Amino acid sequence: MAEPMISIEVAYAAVDRQALIRVQVPQGSTLRAALQASAIGQQFPELDLAACPVGIFGKQVSDPEQHVIQAGDRIEVYRPLLADPKEVRRLRAAKAAEARKRES
């Protein structure tokens, strides 16, 4: 008898395009196995699926090799930030302060 299948989604957003892939995987699959089954790496060859951080519904999963997914889960593949948010805020505040100084 065949294993029961569950439906999940895999999401990834690159700078220039995004993908949301629906895939059927065997019940009891790990997050990493579901990523491989989705073939997201073929659409985005720049992804290192073994090293990139992943999560489910916005919550990062620390051990994707052991985490068992559930029916309806949305697996999200995260990419690194291009700029440090603290540094961006600091630069924006400095620029605003400089603009206020020139206006006075």
UniProtKB/Swiss-Prot annotation:
Entry superkingdom: Bacteria
One Pfam match: Ub-RnfH
Family of the protein in this entry: Belongs to the UPF0125 (RnfH) family.
UniProt-recorded name of the protein: Protein RnfH
Organism annotation: Pseudomonas fluorescens (strain ATCC BAA-477 / NRRL B-23932 / Pf-5)
